[in-house]
Every structure is written in structure tokens, then in C-alpha cells.
């Protein structure tokens, strides 16, 4: 075990032009001497040796790679190489919010704590109010931004990033939240901003298609939802194998299925081009996860969870008159055939060619054009 406390893992893909901003934000940390930086290359042609000379006061390790695998597996290589007690990750085009960010996360560590959550800000385009960063206060967000994780806990519970290239951090975090059910383990929060999520580099998959898609990233209603569905299915199946009597899994499954309804209804209104794809995502989640527990969930419980989630989505639903009630949505899913990849391919074939071309650049769907989940037959 290293004498240092925290590893800062950085997945780096074609990041030579902007990684120095990220490293500079680590250089100024008040607890810099307790930190190890591990850069996991995700492009074999990249060379980051220059950063060791530019930041001589940082302990920096650079991990090579044979091929591009996506941010999840790059982060995992950081975790595998780390010898500290704690780890946090930061994208190469992001920065820590201020010099106290890592100290604030450290101060959140208590006995039996396996994760510390800070607040992150999202950089936004200039606007009349001159606001550049918007705090994101939703503690349950699925990303790894501004969070500190206990490595011993992760390794003991075999919680790792998968090969997913979209919402891979959602799968990772959902595994953690369901795994601590029934154990005296804590996820602590610190009410301080620790991380700035910047707008991203031009090759970021979360930015692809902005110009072609009326100013909104293509990712939001498309591959993000495909990835989130696969991530949730994988997390549920992983946790069920480890503890099939975990009630947290059932609750999470119901909540995710209800969320599929709101995603579909909003997509119909805001981006109908992807409505069929999002309905498929809901069908997939139903058949892979929800169907198995459906008989355990009463209509009253469903109504309560629906009401809670409607409140969460209230601002997103302004001006939208749902074409289906939740229970009509459920009946529609149950009444239609589900054909897995064959059905997904048919839906994708109806999308404009420019969407297919941009999605291919992201690599999310892989060579087979489909994201397989745990135990799914090919």
C-alpha cells in the first residue's frame, strides 16, 4: 500500500492539447503531496511523457495501451494500477474546481465510508447573465465526477468498469449503491463544489452532432439512452448474482423502469426521431429485468413510485401532454414482441444516414452495432 492517500486517475484520448489544464488543477491542490496521478492512455499513438517535465512536483505514472477501449476500461486500468487507499477520476478535459477540492473530499472520509460525493459544476455557454458554470446538486447522478472511492471496497466486491462506452460510469456507480444494501457502509456527501465539468473536447462522444442536431448533442436522446439501458441491466444482473436477496435491487429495477416511461414520453415530444429506439430500450429493460419481478410489485406501489418520479421530472414535462399513461405504456410493452438485436437493427435502419455515420465515430455500438449485456445470447 502506498504511503500516499489518493490516486487521481485520468483516462486520456488525444488529450495532449488540454491535459495540462487538468494537471495544473491537481498541481495547486493543498494536499498535492498525498496524491498520485495515473494517466491511462486510450490511444496507442498518444505521448504524454512531456507532462512529467512540465509538472515535476507531481508523482505521475503513465500507462500504455495496445488499442482504444473507451473511458471505462481506461479508468479501470488506473484502479488496477493504484496502490493508494482511495481513488478519484477526472477526465483529461476537466479540472478540479479550486485548490481545496481534494482536501474537501478527504475531509468527508469517516469510519465505514466507502465513497465521498462532492458537488460538481457544469460549464455552460455564455449567456446574458454571464454565468459560466452551473452547480449540479442531484446527488444521485450516475457519473464519477467529484467522487472519491475506497479501493479496498471496490476490489473486495469485484466492482469494475465494463467495456461500455456510454454510461459506463452509471453501471459502476449503480453496482456500488446496490452492493452496500444491508451492510454498515456509508456514502458521505460534502456540500462543496469540487469538480468543473467543462464543455469537452471536439472528439468527446457527448458533443458529437451538435451542429447537425439543432444545437443539442446527438448523444442525449440516442446513445446515452442505449448505454444507460445496458448499464442498468448489467448492474442489476451483477448485483443479483452476488446477493439475490438484496431488496435494493428490486427497488432500483422498478425506479429505472418508471424512468423509461418518462424518457420515452419526453422523446416523443422533443426528439421523435429517437422515439422508437427509446421504446425499444424500455422493452429491453422490461424483458431483461422488470418482467422477473413484476408480480412482486403491486399497482399501488407502482403508482407511488410513478408519482415520486413525476415530481423529479416535473420541469422536463412542462408543456408535454403524455400520449400514453404509464399503465398504457406498460401494456403496450407487454403486448408487443421483443426480438433483441434484430429489432434494434430494424429501428436503426430507419434513422438518417448522418446519424448512423456520427454514431459510428463514437464507437459506442462497436463492430456489431449493438451493445450486448450480461448473459445475453449472441
Model-inferred region functions:
Residues 45, 268-378:
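Membrane-interface aromatic/basic loop that binds lipid-linked glycans or pyrophosphate carriers
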Residues 71, 113, 128, 143, ...:
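General helical secondary-structure elements
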Residues 223-230, 252, 277, 342:
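Alpha-helix boundary/N-cap detector
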Residues 1-233, 237-245, 337, 348-354, ...:
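Nucleotide-sugar donor-binding/catalytic module of glycosyltransferases
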Residues 173, 250-258, 286, 302:
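Short runs of predominantly hydrophobic/aromatic residues within well-ordered alpha helices
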Residues 246-272:
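P-loop NTPase catalytic cores that bind/hydrolyze ATP
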Residues 177-180, 239, 261-269, 333:
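Generic structural signal for hydrophobic core residues of well-folded globular domains
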Residues 55, 157, 248-252, 289, ...:
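Residue-level recognition of alpha-helix termini/interfacial anchor residues
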